[in-house]
Structures are given as structure tokens and as C-alpha cells.
Amino acid sequence: MRTSSLTVGAFLSASLCAAALADGTWEVLAVADGATPAGLPGIDGAVWVPNTWNNPTIGLDGLVSFRGQIAGAGITNTGATANHLVLVKGLPGAWTVLARNNSSVPGDTPAGCIISRTASPNNSIVSANNITDDGGVVLSGFMTGPGITVGTNDTATWFQPASGAPVLLAQGRDICPGTAGAQYPANMSVGSGLRMNSVGQAPFYMALTGGDTNGTINNAALVLIGPGDDQLIMRKGDAAPGLAGFTVTPDSFGSFLNGTKIAFSGKLVGTGITTANDSVYLTNAGLTGGLRIYAREGDAVPGFKGLTFANTSSFSFGQRPIADNGTITFVATLGGTATTLNNSAVMTEQNGVFSILLRKGDAVPGITDSTDPNFAGKVFSSPNSTGNCMTRNGLFAFEGIIMNADGTSIVSPAPATFVGARLANGTLVTICRQSDPVPGLSGWTFNSLNGSTSICANDLGTVVFNASMANTTAGETGSVIMAWDEALGLRILAKASALSTTPFTPTGDATFTGTPCNQISLIGSTGNNGDGGGTGFSSNGWLTLRAADTVSGLYSIARIKVGPNGNACPADVNGDGTVNAADLAGLLAGWGTSSPDLNGDGTVNAADLAALLAAWGACP
């Protein structure tokens, strides 16, 4: 049954639901039900169209940015006049529209142009899903206007800094720096995964045409686009640093940025080069200018006698592989004296010095020494190739895979996955294991914890991930957003029911949509910026997500402050800084439900009322 806009509106006025007592409270920022006003300035009466949002992003200031579609009087979604697509940033009551189709391009550059894509208006603004630490937003899309030719120079990327006017970064057919007239490709729009830093710079791989382009010899480049002059990082056919007689072709994927530090991969070209030794890994970290090759496929691993970087596969990189100090984290397949029992490792490199953080065959606390026969004697195999994240303070969070001690894979349905963390001091922690009970949910256990958790971590030492779960007795499935840190341990932030064709008891939170949600989505492995931080989970603990009850067609975007001291005043239900009659009314309205549960026991009751009255007055 569809929830009325009145119900949703009443919920928004309360706006919050207590999560775990130590964390903050969920704030619903936007509701898409086709009826609740979007609250966008200058667009009176507009409502969000259900199921049209991309993943929201959030900066250190807690402001959220996302793209979506609107409907209402004077709004159309077809043809050349479509004006239904917007990119916004802010909070309820203070949204800023950064871009809208059939409105001027950001900063009116190029002059007189509008954002428009007649053939595909829903994509006239590209969902770049990126925000810098300080709140700068990437904008990208298609345009029409003076001097614009469709399919030639009608795409562009802009940057809206945290303060000040937006700037044009790149446009189709711009001249590539460091070349004699070679041009950027026609399509200069950017999508998810672009790593923009707070200056407005981002590495961008592109094909080149015209000018001094010579067939396939030099027809591609990796460029650092940004305000002012772009910078050529490497062009296809450039000399390989430190390897005379060889050239490099930069790869079209896997380019990473943290401030001014760049890391990327490429392929060598030259006499004697084969698929066994052609992959190289380059960075400018540790240099005052230029690039260096810090590792090559088939070479010996410096500092580890007998080990080589095996030629069976290239390195894989997690979400934020390059740290502030230039340390690069990667997963490598090892050769030489390595065997099938220990031939892969999570490694780091800093200025030529290599370290092994985790290696295949290592013991895992809570698994190798477990009394549970499902885990006893099992050892570490590998992390998920992209489901891992190194924070700036040295915490390595990962989705882990375990194996039998003899190196054989664990046969399904036996549990073979876990979520773990390696602390900065080297301590290995098992956060949770596949088949473990879900804390606080009787009868529920974790399903596989590999490949779909959207794991993220921040500089405060908090790890957040989305885990699937099951209640086999009840025949139900669902998912939970979990948080973990050393101080507070493992706890649930939100939960969702799975869709079912048979009657079942909904387990999803009603926090977000007023009805039990069946979808909760984190931004995933693309949620990283060029400042070394996350875009869905900020370095100071702000987390944002999408939640939905697709049965009733209700969708929402919400945020929460996660981590120790995330909520110093849980009795402040409406978040206005004072515990007063409004908070009492909100608590009484939720009596007997799970919201707002001040003490985290799952029910709003007399204990919560006592806690609220004891905290009456200004929050500390």
C-alpha cells in the first residue's frame, strides 16, 4: 500500500531515527514519492521522480550532492525542451541547483550555451558521482549553443569548487597539452570513478586525433585536467622512465590521484617485450618532477630474496591505493620461490621500499584458531580485488577470502569469506565472518561477504559495509549496513528486507520511507576522490546512502554521522541542538516502534522517555 505524502511529510518533520546510541541519527534529506515537494529554489512545486537518483556523495561539511529527475508544472522530460534533470548540493531548505538541463552551462562557459541532449535528455547531465573532501563537485554533460557541433565539441566537464564560481575543465576537441595540435576526443564527459581533488584536477585517459598524431603510435594520452592549463602525464609512445629503448602505453583504466600524487599502470613496447614482462606501474610519488616505474611484471621484488612479481596477472588496486605520504598499496601475484600456498600478497611501496601487509597462507585471528569447525584451520587466501580500502592513517579494510590450509578452495556452501581490517600497528582483526549471527537480529546470519559489500573506511578508524543476510528458519533474506571500529565494535546502522513473492515479515527499517525499505545502497568502490578520501563516507564520519521501498514506490536519500561520539546528544531527536517539547513529541509519536530508539534496545519505551527527560535543555 502506498504511503501518502502526508505520512512522508510528517516523517520528514521528525526527520530522524536513532541508530546505535554511540553513532549519530539518520536524517532523511530527500524523498521521491511523486508527491512530496523537492524544495528546490526557483523551481516551485517540483517533486522528485521516484527511482531516478544516482548515488549521493558527501563532503567533510556534511553537505550532500546528487543527480535526479523532477516533475511538475512547466517541467518536461522529452525532446529539445527537456528541463527535468538537475544536479543539486546542500541540505533540506538550503539546496543549491548546480546544473539543470535547458539552463545555462556552469559559469556560462562556453558563453551562451545550455545543457541539452535532445536525443537522450535523461543523460544530458552525466552522473559523475564525485565530491572532493572540501565539498567541490564535478559536473559533466552535453550542451548546445554558439559554436557547438553535436558529436564534435558538445561535451564538457566543469568543476564547482566549495566556494566561488564554477570553471570549465575540458571540452571535446580541446588541444592536448604537450602535443603539436593533437585534440581531445569528442566526448569529454566523465562518469563514476573520476578522482577529482580539491583544486579541481583529475587524471583522464583519452584517445587523441589530429595534429601530430601518428597512426596508433601516439594516439592516446593520460592527462591531468584542471582549472587553467591541463598537464600531460604520459602520452602513448613516450619513453619508459629508466628503461632505455622502451616506450609505454598508459592503460585506459586504473589511474589514481591523491592531491598531487599520481599512480597508474601501462604496457611496455619494445624488443624482447612479451605478455610476461610488459606490465609496468608508474608514479610521481617521491619525485620533485617526472615519473618513475616502481614495479614491473616479472621483476624481482626488492627486499624479498627469491620473490618476483609473477607474470600470471597484473597488480590489482583497491579504492584508495596512494596515501598522503606516497605509499602505494596493491595486491600482487608472486612468483619465484612462492608456491600455490603463498603466491599472492597485499603489499606497499614507498620510495623503493616494499612491505608485505598480508600474504596468502597467513593465519587469521578468529578463523585459523576458531573452535567452529567451519573455520578452524582455515587461512587467508586473498582480499577481493576492489573490495579493499587503505585509509590515510594506515587502516586497511577488506573483504577477505579464506582457504583450506593445503591451498584448496573451500567448497560452497561452507563459509569462505569474512570482513577484516589490518590496523596501522599491524594487528589483524576479523570484523565478522560469513555465517556469523548478525548482531542484534535474532535468527539472522551473514551471507557471503565478498564482492557486494561496498566496503569503505575513514580516517577515524571506522569501517562501513553493506552485507547480505538470511534467516533460514523464516525463509527470509535481507541486507544490513554495518559499522565497526575498535571503540564501539560491530553494530547495525540500517537494514532492508529482500523482495519476496511469498508472505514474509518485513525486516527493513521504516526510518527512510515510512514503510519497511527493501533496498539500501552505498556508493561502492567508485566512491573515492582525488584527495585520498571517500565520497560516500567522509574522512570525518559523514555517511550518505539511498534507501527504497520499491513495492510502494518510495525512495529517499539520508545521512548519518558514524563513529565514536557521532551523536553526543541522542535525545535531541530533531537535531536542533536542544532537547525540548518537539523532541518529546517526536518520541511519543514513535512509541512502541523502533524510532527514535534512544538507548538502542530496539523499542521506543519508558527507558527512552526517561533518557530524554534527563537530557532536557541545551545539548552539551
Regions found by a protein language model. Give the residues of each.
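Sec-dependent, cleavable N-terminal signal peptides
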Residues: 1-23
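Exposed boundary/loop context
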Residues: 2, 193, 319, 570, ...
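Aromatic-enriched hydrophobic runs in primary sequence
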Residues: 4-7, 275, 473, 595, ...
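Conserved "turn/edge" positions that cap or connect secondary-structure elements
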Residues: 21-567
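Cellulosome-associated attachment modules in secreted, modular CAZymes
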Residues: 563-620
